Design a protein with these regions (language model features):
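Short, charged, surface-exposed secondary-structure boundary motifs
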Residues: 10-13, 38, 84-87
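Beta-alpha-beta core module
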Residues: 61-110
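Short beta-strand-to-loop elements that line the ligand-binding cleft
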Residues: 28, 48-60
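Secondary-structure junction motif
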Residues: 17, 22-47, 112
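Hydrophobic/proline-rich hinge and linker segments of small-molecule sensing/allosteric domains
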Residues: 1-30, 97-108, 120
Length: 124
């Protein structure tokens, strides 16, 4: 999760789910991600002390800015830890992992196609 550098949780090395009690967790809306849908259902069922705010499917700078400005907590990926200078990323102790892949255009140029094929071959 990401929080503003001034957030009460910002000094923690790792978060427990109970650290999120009383917080608003920003995450993609239902239907955008199977893993996030499972996490949302779990939080709504077992941890109702955490409020959830829907974000667009693809985070843009406005989502990161909103997190920094509101003091909300943003569900984010470790690989995005340096995307916004006003936020820090802290891992959470839970059993949810987001699979990550390659993002590329539907009709990519030839060099991108060759790269994707090389990655596919390496993954086999």
């Amino acid at each position: 999760c990401a929080v503003s550098r001034e957030h009460a949780l910002a000094g923690k090395k790792k978060l427990k789910i109970t650290d999120l009690y009383g917080q608003t967790l920003m995450m993609v809306q239902t239907g955008d991600s199977e893993v996030n849908d499972r996490l949302r259902a779990y939080l709504q069922r077992e941890h109702q002390q955490i409020w959830i705010e829907d974000t667009p499917r693809f985070y843009d700078i406005s989502v990161f800015n909103r997190c920094a400005e509101t003091g909300n907590v943003l569900l984010t990926l470790e690989c995005w830890k340096d995307v916004h200078p006003g936020l820090i990323t802290i891992p959470v102790e839970w059993d949810y992992r987001i699979p990550y892949g390659l993002l590329y255009a539907q009709n990519p140029p030839e060099d991108v196609r060759r790269f994707v094929e090389a990655v596919r071959a390496a993954m086999r």
